């Protein structure tokens, strides 16, 4: 028979971990000042008022390089545990990792051919 009392610690942890962030948001909403003056709405950088427009637009190339970096960084995060337990795992896991790497290679070749890695 399925006994719910075996999961009491789990339910207590779930309730507590849900209530604490909710309380933190509620308390900060009650205690935070509501009025926003001109000091709050102005840009602040190193104690100096900004001259001209404070917003700078970045070129899309920065985002493309960052996106490619994140993809390969996540690849490293996924492949590191596999590499550490390579001798324990079987051939099927090796084939799965090979397919994963091949998909990423195809994606990088596609990005390269589309010009995502060219700066000019």
UniProtKB/Swiss-Prot annotation:
A Pfam family annotated for this UniProt entry: Oxidored_q4
Gene Ontology CC terms, in alphabetical order: chloroplast thylakoid membrane; NADH dehydrogenase complex
Subunit structure: NDH is composed of at least 16 different subunits, 5 of which are encoded in the nucleus.
Coiled-coil annotated residue ranges, if any: none
Source organism superkingdom: Eukaryota
Annotated protein name in UniProt: NAD(P)H-quinone oxidoreductase subunit 3, chloroplastic
Annotated transmembrane regions: 9-29, 64-84, 88-108
Role of this protein: NDH shuttles electrons from NAD(P)H:plastoquinone, via FMN and iron-sulfur (Fe-S) centers, to quinones in the photosynthetic chain and possibly in a chloroplast respiratory chain. The immediate electron acceptor for the enzyme in this species is believed to be plastoquinone. Couples the redox reaction to proton translocation, and thus conserves the redox energy in a proton gradient.
Top-level enzyme category: translocase
Membrane topology: Multi-pass membrane protein
Gene Ontology MF annotations: NADH dehydrogenase (ubiquinone) activity; quinone binding
Biological process annotations from GO: photosynthesis, light reaction
Keyword terms of this UniProt record: Chloroplast, Membrane, NAD, NADP, Plastid, Plastoquinone, Quinone, Thylakoid, Translocase, Transmembrane, Transmembrane helix, Transport
InterPro entries: NAD(P)H_OxRDtase_bac/plastid, NADH_UbQ/plastoQ_OxRdtase_su3, NDAH_ubi_oxred_su3_sf
Assigned protein family: Belongs to the complex I subunit 3 family.
Subcellular localization(s) per the UniProt record: Plastid, Chloroplast thylakoid membrane
EC number(s) per entry: 7.1.1.-
Catalytic activity: a plastoquinone + NADH + (n+1) H(+)(in) = a plastoquinol + NAD(+) + n H(+)(out); a plastoquinone + NADPH + (n+1) H(+)(in) = a plastoquinol + NADP(+) + n H(+)(out)
The keyword Transcription regulation belongs to this UniProt entry's keyword annotation: no
């Amino acid at each position: 028979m399925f006994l719910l009392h075996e999961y009491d610690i789990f339910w207590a942890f779930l309730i507590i971990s849900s209530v604490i962030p909710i309380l933190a948001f509620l308390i900060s909403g009650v205690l935070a000042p509501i009025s926003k003056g001109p000091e709050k709405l102005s840009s602040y950088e190193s104690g100096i008022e900004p001259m001209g427009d404070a917003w700078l637009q970045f070129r899309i190339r920065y985002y493309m390089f960052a996106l490619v970096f994140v993809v390969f960084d996540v690849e490293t995060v996924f492949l590191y545990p596999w590499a550490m337990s390579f001798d324990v795992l079987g051939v099927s896991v090796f084939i799965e990792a090979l397919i994963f790497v091949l998909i990423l290679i195809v994606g990088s070749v596609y990005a390269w051919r589309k010009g995502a890695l060219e700066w000019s």
